[in-house]
Swiss-Prot record:
This is Ribonuclease HII. Its EC number is 3.1.26.4. It is an enzyme of class 3 (hydrolase). The gene is rnhB. InterPro entries: RNase_HII (IPR022898), RNase_HII/HIII (IPR001352), RNase_HII/HIII_dom (IPR024567), RNaseH-like_sf (IPR012337), RNaseH_sf (IPR036397). Residues 6-195 form the RNase H type-2 domain. It is found in: Cytoplasm. Its cofactor is Mn(2+); Mg(2+). Belongs to the RNase HII family.
């Protein structure tokens, strides 16, 4: 049994730049032993993995982590509070689901979570430096993509099953032709119309 002296959670988000749907965040706590196991199984930055590789890693991350959580902030929350605050809200929601707060959080990027009361460290391209952030990036991406796939059946004219809510040319063209749904980020779309 590994002696765990402190709980360190990696935190990452996905979907910040999308026109559709919530922003998701995940937080993952790994032991050193399980970090090595997951890295040996191919864990790395979710952007460097295929969809199949990410999908296969999800159960491994869930079973090999000490704890993992998911948080999200809706398109409406993004419109009301802005993407930075909504992203932080999603991260806080994930972190607050842990039964006890981690001793340290590792946040992907340069911006700390302003309302987090505990210790934190930011790291640009954190998913390339810390296995726990890489694991969080995979969980957040796969969880959000699964939701968008389900929503694509209901909102089938926007190409969501392929673009996952990002502002591809097809998505933008359909927005002009069909209009926005209640799950589109109105603040993002209004910026598109100005350009």
């Amino acid at each position: 049994m590994e002696d765990i002296k402190s709980l360190i959670a990696g935190v990452d988000e996905v979907g910040k730049g999308c026109l559709f749907g919530p922003v998701f965040a995940a937080a993952v706590i790994l032991s050193k032993k399980n970090e090595i196991e997951l890295l040996n199984q191919g864990l790395k930055d979710s952007k460097k993995l295929s969809q199949r590789q990410r999908h296969n890693l999800v159960p491994l991350i869930k079973t090999n982590s000490i704890a993992w959580t998911i948080g999200q902030a809706s398109a409406r929350e993004i419109d009301v509070m802005g993407i930075r605050d909504a992203t932080e809200k999603a991260m806080l929601r994930a972190l607050e689901k842990f039964s006890s707060p981690p001793d340290l959080i590792l946040v992907d990027g340069i911006l700390p979570i302003r309302l987090w009361p505990g210790k934190q460290k930011t790291q640009v391209r954190g998913e390339s430096h810390f296995a726990s952030i890489a694991a969080a990036s995979v969980l957040a991406k796969e969880t959000r993509d699964e939701l968008i796939k389900r929503l694509a059946r209901k909102y089938n004219c926007y190409g969501l099953e392929k673009n996952k809510g990002y502002g591809t040319e097809i998505h933008r063209t359909k927005l002009i032709k069909e209009g926005a749904t209640k799950l589109h980020r109105k603040s993002f779309i209004s910026r598109l119309k100005k350009n």
